[in-house]
Each structure stands twice: as structure tokens, then as C-alpha cells.
Swiss-Prot record:
<dbReference type="InterPro" id="IPR011009">
    <property type="entry name" value="Kinase-like_dom_sf"/>
</dbReference>
<feature type="topological domain" description="Cytoplasmic">
    <location>
        <begin position="42"/>
        <end position="396"/>
    </location>
</feature>
<dbReference type="Pfam" id="PF07714">
    <property type="entry name" value="PK_Tyr_Ser-Thr"/>
</dbReference>
<comment type="function">
    <text>Pseudokinase which plays a role in resistance to fungal infection by promoting expression of antimicrobial peptides (nlp-29, nlp-31, nlp-34, cnc-1, cnc-2 and cnc-4) in the epidermis. In addition, up-regulates nlp-29 expression upon physical wounding and in response to phorbol ester PMA treatment.</text>
</comment>
<keyword id="KW-0472">Membrane</keyword>
<dbReference type="GO" id="GO:0005524">
    <property type="term" value="F:ATP binding"/>
</dbReference>
<feature type="glycosylation site" description="N-linked (GlcNAc...) asparagine">
    <location>
        <position position="15"/>
    </location>
</feature>
<protein>
    <recommendedName>
        <fullName>Protein nipi-4</fullName>
    </recommendedName>
</protein>
<feature type="binding site">
    <location>
        <position position="111"/>
    </location>
    <ligand>
        <name>ATP</name>
    </ligand>
</feature>
<dbReference type="GO" id="GO:0004672">
    <property type="term" value="F:protein kinase activity"/>
</dbReference>
<dbReference type="GO" id="GO:0005886">
    <property type="term" value="C:plasma membrane"/>
</dbReference>
<dbReference type="InterPro" id="IPR000719">
    <property type="entry name" value="Prot_kinase_dom"/>
</dbReference>
<feature type="binding site">
    <location>
        <begin position="87"/>
        <end position="95"/>
    </location>
    <ligand>
        <name>ATP</name>
    </ligand>
</feature>
<keyword id="KW-0812">Transmembrane</keyword>
<feature type="transmembrane region" description="Helical">
    <location>
        <begin position="21"/>
        <end position="41"/>
    </location>
</feature>
<dbReference type="GO" id="GO:0010628">
    <property type="term" value="P:positive regulation of gene expression"/>
</dbReference>
<keyword id="KW-1133">Transmembrane helix</keyword>
Length: 396
């Protein structure tokens, strides 16, 4: 006789009741899983925005050092505002107009206008921008812009964003363009040579300070960005304005730049066989000589519409392709010529003798007559190509 092992109906009903999940329990369980998924995504989302780990790995140690050394400048990304207005572009990234909000109760009423630099989404460019920020944080001079803040996301999302000091007068290049070259003769404010020498003296003081500093390898620091668009003015009145040298960075990297920047490069860099030649203090002196010429002409473009080969040919000329402005005194032009001489013959900024650039500018500022004025020199080109629409040889 076979035994019936089928459980009674009451036992079956009890087992089904034990394994059955009520609608409330289902909602609670699904909500818990949903919250866990959100928590995991929020925790990992910043890492998902980073470049591939194999591209970051070679820089990981240096990145940790940079974060430690820049800790006094780190602020929340919400405290840095970026406007739509783009000021310019460098080898490392873009520069926008922006601001920094202090950590106070009335923070939105105490906004500090700044220039915000954002790196390109390339690992090497990001590291280079952070290196520039570290270098600038160690410098303190009244004629150098200051580093104000570094976003904390610079070391998490790994696209650095730094805030730099910005002056209300804008750049010296903008002053020349909008206050001088685009104005009629009757609307232009007269510019004394004496006032321009004061501006040149302030820039030379900043370069003298930079060249007196040493890097981690014991070498003199250099600037490598001595252009009018990198000089900020406190107000649009050159008679009483102060200037600061900005955009401190590494040396110009070979021929990766456009022709307007190549026009400032010395022969030993432009004609060098190396792709990234070393930048030395005497290279800054050459660039400062071109900068003086640019100021004496009130914003004329050096080597206007010349190709790289044409610029190299200009180096063989006595004036290096930069003709002396008509109203420039001989003593001032002698300084320009000395800066554009052979590397071993160029004067220095950090020299303690009276032959230094700073000392000579100070002396010139005292002896130059206030009756000497500067006039805008038009850009002159021998180009007649259709590409540039060159129907005239004079361009303001």
C-alpha cells in the first residue's frame, strides 16, 4: 500500500503566504535598489569624466604634488564664475572673463573680476596649466598678475580651471587698437614718449624679478609671453596708469603658434632645428625689444603679413625687419637695437650694472623731453595676394 505524501491544503497555503511579497515590500525593495544605483553613479561619475587611466598614470605622482602645493588656492567650483566673453587663447587652453566669489555672507555682492583660464581636454595641457599656476603662486611683484584661485575639480575632473587677476583697463593691445588706431586723428589723445617709457620700465621691473628667481633645476625663470596683449593696465590713461605683466607660462613651443606670435621669437628659437628649443633669459630680451617697437609704433604688428621664411630673411637686415619710428630718439632706438642683437651681446634685466635694461629705461625716462609725442605707425606690407585682399600697402 503506497503512502500519500501530498501535504494537506492548510500547509500549502502557509508556505505560499510566507514566500509572497506584499506590494508595500516590493516598493520598499525597489526603492532601496534605486537609491543604491544613484549613490553608486554619483560616487563614480567624476571618475567617469576623467581621461583614460593609462594616460593619467604617468602624471599621477606629479598631480598629487601639485594639489598639495596649491591647497591654499583651492576653492569650490561654484565660487568661480565664467562668462561667455572669451579674452584669448594660449597654448594650454582658453581664457574667459569671469569672477571669484569670496566665502562670505554677502558673497554675491563682493565679486572679484578675474580672467579664468580653462585647459584643453588633453592631459599634457592640463598638467602644463597647473604647473603655470604653481609657478605664478610663488611669485610676488607689483607688476605681475596674481593667482587668485584654483578650482578643486582641477584634480578630480582633470580639466583645470584657474582664476587670475584682471585689471579694469584691459590689455595694452586693446588700448592701442580701440583708443588709438581706430580713432581719427582729432579724437586720439596725445601720448607722450615719457609716459610710454614709464610703462616699459614697469614691465622691465617684472622681468627683472622673474629672471632673478630660480626654478627647481636651479635655472633662471623666463617669461616667454612678452606681448602687448599680455600687459594689463589699471585704467585707460597712460599718464597715470600702472601695468602688470600677465600670462606667465613656459617658453613658446617651436612653430606650433600662429605667425603673429612667431613674429616675436628670436632667431635662435625660430631657426632652431629642435621642435621645442630651450627658452633662455636672452630670448626674453629679444621679445622685449620687439615689445618696445610695438609700443613706440602704438600697436603696429611686427613683421606684418610676413611668412616664416620672410621673417627669417629679415633677421639678416640691420634693423631686423623692424624700422625705426620717425619720432623715436636715438638713445631709445639704441636700446631696441641692443635687445635685437646677438644673444651674447644683449643686455640683461637682472644685471646690477648701469647697463641693465631697467637702469637704461629709468635714465631715459628722466632725460626724455615731455614735448616728445608718439604717433600711430600704420602696418606696412608688400603683400599683393588676393587671399589677404591686399589692394593697399597701408593698414591700421
Amino acid at each position: 500500500m503506497e503512502l500519500d505524501h501530498t501535504p494537506p491544503p492548510s500547509v500549502l497555503n502557509d508556505n505560499c503566504s510566507a514566500s509572497y511579497m506584499t506590494p508595500y515590500a516590493t516598493v520598499i525593495a525597489m526603492s532601496g535598489l534605486y537609491l543604491l544605483a544613484i549613490f553608486y553613479f554619483c560616487k563614480k561619475s567624476k571618475k567617469m569624466c576623467q581621461p583614460m587611466s593609462d594616460s593619467i598614470y604617468p602624471y599621477q605622482k606629479r598631480l598629487t604634488q601639485l594639489e598639495r602645493e596649491l591647497k591654499n588656492y583651492l576653492i569650490d567650483e561654484e565660487s568661480i564664475e565664467v562668462d561667455d566673453f572669451q579674452i584669448g587663447q594660449t597654448a594650454d587652453g582658453f581664457i574667459f572673463r569671469g569672477g571669484v566669489f569670496p566665502k562670505t555672507r554677502n558673497r554675491f555682492n563682493a565679486k572679484v573680476t578675474t580672467a579664468v583660464k580653462i585647459s584643453f581636454p588633453i592631459v599634457s595641457k592640463s598638467i602644463s596649466l597647473l604647473e603655470d599656476a604653481l609657478r605664478l603662486s610663488k611669485l610676488d611683484h607689483p607688476n605681475l598678475i596674481r593667482l587668485l584661485a584654483v578650482s578643486q575639480l582641477s584634480f578630480t575632473v582633470f580639466r583645470p580651471m584657474i582664476a587670475l587677476e584682471w585689471l579694469p583697463g584691459g590689455t595694452l593691445a586693446d588700448y592701442f587698437q580701440f583708443k588709438v588706431r581706430e580713432k581719427d586723428d582729432s579724437e586720439r589723445s596725445p601720448i607722450q614718449l615719457k609716459d610710454m617709457l614709464s610703462i616699459l620700465y614697469q614691465v622691465s621691473q617684472a622681468l627683472k624679478y622673474i629672471h632673478s628667481q630660480l626654478d627647481e633645476f636651479g635655472q633662471e625663470l623666463t617669461h616667454g609671453r612678452i606681448f602687448t596683449r599680455n600687459v594689463l593696465v589699471t585704467e585707460p590713461d597712460l599718464r597715470k596708469c600702472e601695468v602688470k605683466l600677465g600670462d606667465f607660462g613656459d617658453a613658446p613651443m617651436g612653430l606650433e603658434y600662429s605667425t603673429p606670435i612667431i613674429a616675436y621669437m628670436p632667431p635662435e628659437i625660430l631657426c632652431c632645428a629642435e621642435r621645442i628649443p630651450p627658452h633662455r633669459p636672452e630670448n626674453d630680451v629679444w621679445m622685449f625689444g620687439v615689445f618696445i617697437w610695438e609700443c613706440l609704433t602704438l600697436g603696429a604688428q611686427p613683421h606684418f603679413r610676413k611668412s616664416v621664411e620672410e621673417i627669417k630673411k629679415s633677421f639678416r637686415l640691420p634693423d631686423r625687419g623692424l624700422s625705426c619710428p620717425p619720432t623715436c630718439p636715438l638713445d631709445v632706438w639704441t636700446l631696441v637695437s641692443d635687445c635685437l642683437s646677438e644673444p651674447h651681446m644683449r643686455p640683461r634685466f637682472a644685471s646690477t650694472t648701469n647697463a641693465s635694461i631697467t637702469s637704461r629705461l629709468s635714465e631715459l625716462h628722466h632725460i626724455v623731453s615731455p614735448a616728445l609725442f608718439l604717433y600711430a605707425i600704420p602696418n606696412q606690407s608688400v603683400c599683393t595676394c588676393i587671399e589677404h585682399h591686399c589692394q593697399s600697402v597701408i593698414h591700421y
